[in-house]
Each structure stands twice: as structure tokens, then as C-alpha cells.
């Protein structure tokens, strides 16, 4: 590639004047040495020179600069290489991919001002929501009317004891939760056998005192009787 004819070289400075002869000499002495290594060694040697040793090369650089200004009075230095800061800036700038619009209303194909109208009209905005699993919406209290509450009360009057496997262990006779059927069938209430703090409505007969007595395990050793180790039975008989 040919160089442009209008390119004007810069005038040499003192280091370039000195290194011009030294580079040729060092390249002849070390033919396998790379040019960058030669430049490093020449720079280190230039710094070790005294001002008296540098003076002839400084004067020669001033003469060359004055001659260059006479030959090219309109010369302006224009670097062909980009500055290092611009190279670093261009190196780490990566274009970000377009991930699409994050607004779901715009992605649905709605006009620009449609989102404001949907916020002011809940009925319109509800059409874009997924269907709820519950039959009644928490946002519409009109659905909880008296007829809806009556429909919720229409449950079977008596559940079979086999449907609830723990009904027999709790002492229910006519159904596990038959009291949940209708208010007219609630004959009485009694404390729960498992938790006396709760009252259970039921249409069965009341529990007797013997059914509320917790079971007691006895361990009899030779020479011992049950009456001697049963303080609970004696205390219960005294209270009765």
C-alpha cells in the first residue's frame, strides 16, 4: 500500500537523532533481536546520558525543527493512530441486544393510552388477568349476597362415619360431623373429648363420666393389688 503523497513527517527530536545511529549499530551486533527490544534498550541508555552528552543531539533537533518550519509553514501534526484512551473506550463498548418491550400491555398490542384507561376501569382490566381458581372474586363484594350464603349452607345433613376414618375414635355415634348439617338438628353441645376447651355441637346423646375418663395402664407385680395403686379411681369415687 503506497503512502499518500501529501503526508509530511514530523521533525526528529533529540532522542530520534541520537538513536538513528545507535539503532543501526545495535541491530548489526544483535541480528536476532526484535525491534521493540532494541527500542527499550535505547531508551534506557538515553536516560543514562548526561546533559553534556545530550547537548549536541538537542542542538541538532532544534536545527531540524527550524528547517522543517521553513519548508512547511502550514504544517500541523495529525496523528494517524487513534489515542490510547479512544482505543480503550471502543474496545469495551458492547452493543446490548434488544430484549423486547417489558410492558405487557404494549406487548399485547394495545395503543399507547390504553393502559391509563384500564387502570381507571377495573372491569376492562380484569379481562387481561388470568382466570382465578376460586369461584368468587375478592374484588366484587356483590357476589356475596344472601342467596350465595344460603347455597353455601346447603351441605349434606349427615356424613357417613366411614368417610372420616377418625370418627369412631373421637366418640361420635350418629356421624362424624353430623352437627354441621342444619341448625334444627343441634340438640345439645358438649366439650370435646380430646380438647375440653372447645365445645362441639352434636345431635348424639351426651357422654357419660365414664367415657370422659382417660385410659390408665396398670403394671402389677407379685404381691400387689389394683386398689393399692389406683389413686385416680379412689379420688374419682370420692368426688362422685
Curated annotation (Swiss-Prot):
Regions recorded as binding DNA: 8-76
Function: Acts as a negative regulator of transcription.
SMART domains reported in the protein's UniProt record: HMG
Keyword Transcription regulation among UniProt keywords: yes
Designated gene of the protein: SOX14
CDD domains cross-referenced by the UniProt entry: HMG-box_SoxB
Localisation per UniProt entry: Nucleus
GO BP term, example: entrainment of circadian clock
One GO CC term, this protein: chromatin
Top-level taxon of origin: Eukaryota
GO molecular function: chromatin binding; DNA-binding transcription activator activity, RNA polymerase II-specific; DNA-binding transcription factor activity, RNA polymerase II-specific; RNA polymerase II cis-regulatory region sequence-specific DNA binding; sequence-specific DNA binding; sequence-specific double-stranded DNA binding
Any matching Pfam family: HMG_box
UniProt name for this protein: Transcription factor SOX-14
Chief location category: nucleus
InterPro entries: HMG_box_dom (IPR009071), HMG_box_dom_sf (IPR036910), SOX_fam (IPR022097), SRY-related_HMG-box_TF-like (IPR050140)
UniProt xrefs under SUPFAM superfamilies: HMG-box
Keywords annotated in UniProt: DNA-binding, Nucleus, Repressor, Transcription, Transcription regulation
Amino acid at each position: 500500500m503506497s503512502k499518500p503523497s501529501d503526508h509530511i513527517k514530523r521533525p526528529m527530536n533529540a532522542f530520534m537523532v541520537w538513536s538513528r545511529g545507535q539503532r543501526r549499530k545495535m541491530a548489526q551486533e544483535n541480528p536476532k533481536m526484535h525491534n521493540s527490544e532494541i527500542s527499550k534498550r535505547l531508551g534506557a541508555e538515553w536516560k543514562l546520558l548526561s546533559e553534556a552528552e545530550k547537548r549536541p543531539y538537542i542542538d541538532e533537533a532544534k536545527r531540524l525543527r527550524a528547517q522543517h518550519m521553513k519548508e512547511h509553514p502550514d504544517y500541523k501534526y495529525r496523528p494517524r493512530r487513534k489515542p490510547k484512551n479512544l482505543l480503550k473506550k471502543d474496545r469495551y463498548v458492547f452493543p446490548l441486544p434488544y430484549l423486547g418491550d417489558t410492558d405487557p400491555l404494549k406487548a399485547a398490542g394495545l395503543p399507547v393510552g390504553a393502559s391509563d384507561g384500564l387502570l381507571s376501569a377495573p372491569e376492562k382490566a380484569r379481562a387481561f388477568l388470568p382466570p382465578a381458581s376460586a369461584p368468587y372474586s375478592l374484588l366484587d363484594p356483590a357476589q356475596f349476597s344472601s342467596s350465595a350464603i344460603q347455597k353455601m349452607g346447603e351441605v349434606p345433613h349427615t356424613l357417613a362415619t366411614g368417610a372420616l376414618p377418625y370418627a369412631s375414635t373421637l366418640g361420635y355415634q350418629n356421624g362424624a360431623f353430623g352437627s354441621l348439617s342444619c341448625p334444627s338438628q343441634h340438640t345439645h353441645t358438649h366439650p370435646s373429648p380430646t380438647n375440653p376447651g372447645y365445645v362441639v355441637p352434636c345431635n348424639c346423646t351426651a357422654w357419660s363420666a365414664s367415657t370422659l375418663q382417660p385410659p390408665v395402664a396398670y403394671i402389677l407385680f407379685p404381691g400387689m393389688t389394683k386398689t393399692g395403686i389406683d389413686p385416680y379411681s379412689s379420688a374419682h369415687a370420692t368426688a362422685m
